[in-house]
């Protein structure tokens, strides 16, 4: 008969979460509190993890941006990052990085999803809605679709 499993210690549970992916301090705290005897115990563990550099809000932000930047715009990613209560300095750095690459990321997503200029106003509106729902700015979306329209017009002239 197999022996019953010992419950994981709080530290083992935290390291298990961190071994799978980066977590923000707020997110890891939320996951650990139900398994702890007190909130102070969790805070002490989180302080220790940060001291050992096993928990880092900066690394979490970089990881999240790396995972999701190809599918979402700056506005959407910043909204998600703000829910993790990262520092203003970290958020500012991430926002600057995202804004510098937003046009390239938006163009790549647009080409993957649509690949051709809109044929009429209804299709144009659909493309704009799709891109804006993913957090890309109106100006970037307009430039990409306008650029696609110009490519279509240039193609018509060469025929």
Curated annotation (Swiss-Prot):
One GO BP on record is:
regulation of DNA repair
An example Pfam family from this entry, by short name, is RecX_HTH2
The answer to whether the entry has keyword Membrane is no
Quote the InterPro entries the UniProt record gives: RecX_HTH_1st (IPR053926), RecX_HTH_2nd (IPR053924), RecX_HTH_3rd (IPR053925), Regulatory_RecX (IPR003783), WH-like_DNA-bd_sf (IPR036388)
Where found, per UniProt?
Cytoplasm
What keywords are annotated for this sequence in UniProt? Cytoplasm
Q: Which GO terms describe its cellular component?
A: cytoplasm
Asked if Cytoplasm is a keyword of the record, the answer is yes
Q: Give me the disulphide-bonded residues.
A: none
Membership in a protein family: Belongs to the RecX family.
Function of the protein: Modulates RecA activity.
**Protein's UniProt name:** Regulatory protein RecX
In its UniProt entry, the species of origin is given as Ralstonia pickettii (strain 12J)
Organism lineage = Bacteria, Pseudomonadati, Pseudomonadota, Betaproteobacteria, Burkholderiales
């Amino acid at each position: 008969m197999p022996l019953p499993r010992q419950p994981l210690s709080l530290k083992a549970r935290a390291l298990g979460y961190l071994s799978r992916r980066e977590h923000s301090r707020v997110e890891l705290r939320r996951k650990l509190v139900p398994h702890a005897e007190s909130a102070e115990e969790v805070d002490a563990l989180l302080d220790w993890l940060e001291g050992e550099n096993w928990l880092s809000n900066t690394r979490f932000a970089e990881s999240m941006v790396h995972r999701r930047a190809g599918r979402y715009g700056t506005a959407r990613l910043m909204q998600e990052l703000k829910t993790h209560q990262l520092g203003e300095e970290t958020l500012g750095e991430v926002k600057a990085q995202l804004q510098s690459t937003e046009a390239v990321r938006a163009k790549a997503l647009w080409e993957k999803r649509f690949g051709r200029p809109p044929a009429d106003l209804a299709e144009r509106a659909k493309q704009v809605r799709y891109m804006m729902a993913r957090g890309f700015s109106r100006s970037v979306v307009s430039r990409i679709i306008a650029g696609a329209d110009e490519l279509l017009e240039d193609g018509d002239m060469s025929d």
